[in-house]
Amino acid sequence: MPRSLKKGPFVDEHLAKKVTAQNEAGTHNVIKTWSRRSMVTPDMIGHTIGVHDGRKHVPVFVTESMVGHKLGEFAPTRTFKGHVKDDKKARRR
């Protein structure tokens, strides 16, 4: 079930402070965050946010089409290495 419209989007306070500080200063440095649950807001457009995936911070450049999504959607936590091919020739020998 989606979040109620009367509540508004959830953004962690520390992340919102960093974004507004960079907007006022006019800088676009990478903002590191562990807050994967925060929603992308229009004031984040043009910033690069380092979203933690459990191991490292994945740089995510925020565009207009990302508004309304959560930051965690853009930093996958699992790496799929692929299924190992079954080598039947080696087994026969």
From Swiss-Prot:
GO terms for biological process: ribosomal small subunit assembly; translation. Gene3D superfamilies: 30s Ribosomal Protein S19, Chain A. The keyword Ribonucleoprotein applies. GO terms for molecular function: rRNA binding; structural constituent of ribosome. InterPro entries: Ribosomal_uS19, Ribosomal_uS19_bac-type, Ribosomal_uS19_CS, Ribosomal_uS19_SF. Keywords: Ribonucleoprotein, Ribosomal protein, RNA-binding, rRNA-binding. SUPFAM superfamilies: Ribosomal protein S19. One of its GO terms (cellular component) is cytoplasm. Pfam families: Ribosomal_S19. PANTHER family: RIBOSOMAL PROTEIN S19P FAMILY MEMBER, SMALL RIBOSOMAL SUBUNIT PROTEIN US19M. Protein S19 forms a complex with S13 that binds strongly to the 16S ribosomal RNA. Belongs to the universal ribosomal protein uS19 family. This is Small ribosomal subunit protein uS19. The lineage of its organism: Bacteria, Bacillati, Actinomycetota, Actinomycetes, Propionibacteriales. The gene is rpsS.
